[in-house]
């Protein structure tokens, strides 16, 4: 029973992180498409959609692998910047 509860908690955590990443990508892409100037300091270019998506996928991969390592009891690594 405890294993089922732990697995459910892991899936909930992974699902929450996936939701957050997708929400971040959606918001960044929409801001880029609409062109809200308040997100970018004067004289800078908005972040390219591909950069936001690539970065979000890297963070998602790190989060999923980190969660797996924590479950298996392996050592932790720093998140990619």
Swiss-Prot record:
Keywords: Developmental protein. The keyword DNA damage does not apply. One of its GO terms (cellular component) is cytoplasm. GO terms for biological process: brain development; establishment of localization in cell; insulin secretion; neuron differentiation; positive regulation of insulin secretion; regulation of protein localization; response to glucose. Brain. It comes from the Eukaryota. The keyword Plastid does not apply. Belongs to the neuronatin family. May participate in the maintenance of segment identity in the hindbrain and pituitary development, and maturation or maintenance of the overall structure of the nervous system. This is Neuronatin. It comes from Rattus norvegicus (Rat).
């Amino acid at each position: 029973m405890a294993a089922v509860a732990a697995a459910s908690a892991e899936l909930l955590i992974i699902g929450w992180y996936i939701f957050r990443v997708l929400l971040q990508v959606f918001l960044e892409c929409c801001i880029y498409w609409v062109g809200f100037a308040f997100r970018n300091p004067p004289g800078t270019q908005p972040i390219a959609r591909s950069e936001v998506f690539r970065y979000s996928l890297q963070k998602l991969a790190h989060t999923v692998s980190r969660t797996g390592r924590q479950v298996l009891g392996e050592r932790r690594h720093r998140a990619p910047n």
